[in-house]
């Protein structure tokens, strides 16, 4: 008893020790004299560090501002601000490949000490337009005239193959590569 003791601040990821904290009835008491009745209580206060939730386009285009907050604060997940041609945005995920925790816009996200990031998740659109042009090449192989253009649809990034058409008096040449044609 009657010994003076001093508490040692711990390292808590995402928090900073406040040796002079004195707010709302909370006050840091880092040292004191040990009373015989065991009534000494030392209180050390740590405040949360600034933190932010970053958003990644994950194949999309554009930029989005991070959602600002502090460690352990629940922040609202932002609506998507990215674009990706031929794709529809389907939500956010903590992993780029979609294997992590999924989040929707407006959902709560608890900031953690360290990096907090969400990755846009996309699904390929069905019905993405593409065109197949069928050309007739002149006898000298120096010019070509468009005979027919097919406007077709497929899933974005799907591998497609053109089907040759029958053009009377012409033979399809699958490996034709002359004079820039």
PLM features per residue range, with description:
Residues 1-181:
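Secondary-structure capping and domain/repeat boundary segments
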């Amino acid at each position: 008893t009657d010994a003076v003791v001093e508490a040692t601040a711990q390292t808590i990821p995402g928090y900073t020790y406040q040796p002079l904290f004195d707010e709302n009835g909370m006050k840091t008491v880092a040292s004191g004299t040990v009373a015989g009745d065991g009534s000494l209580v030392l209180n050390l206060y740590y405040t949360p560090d600034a933190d932010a939730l970053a958003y990644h386009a994950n194949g999309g285009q554009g930029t989005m501002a991070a959602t600002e907050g502090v460690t352990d604060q629940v922040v609202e997940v932002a609506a998507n601000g990215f674009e990706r041609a031929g794709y529809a945005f389907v939500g956010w995920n903590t992993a780029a490949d979609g294997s992590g925790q999924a989040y929707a816009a407006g959902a709560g996200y608890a900031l953690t000490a360290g990096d907090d990031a969400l990755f846009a998740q996309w699904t390929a659109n069905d019905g993405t337009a593409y065109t197949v042009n069928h050309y007739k090449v002149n006898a000298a192989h120096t010019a070509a005239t468009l005979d027919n253009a097919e406007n077709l649809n497929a899933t974005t990034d799907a591998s497609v193959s053109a089907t040759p058409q029958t053009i009377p008096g012409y033979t399809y040449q699958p490996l034709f590569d002359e004079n820039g044609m």
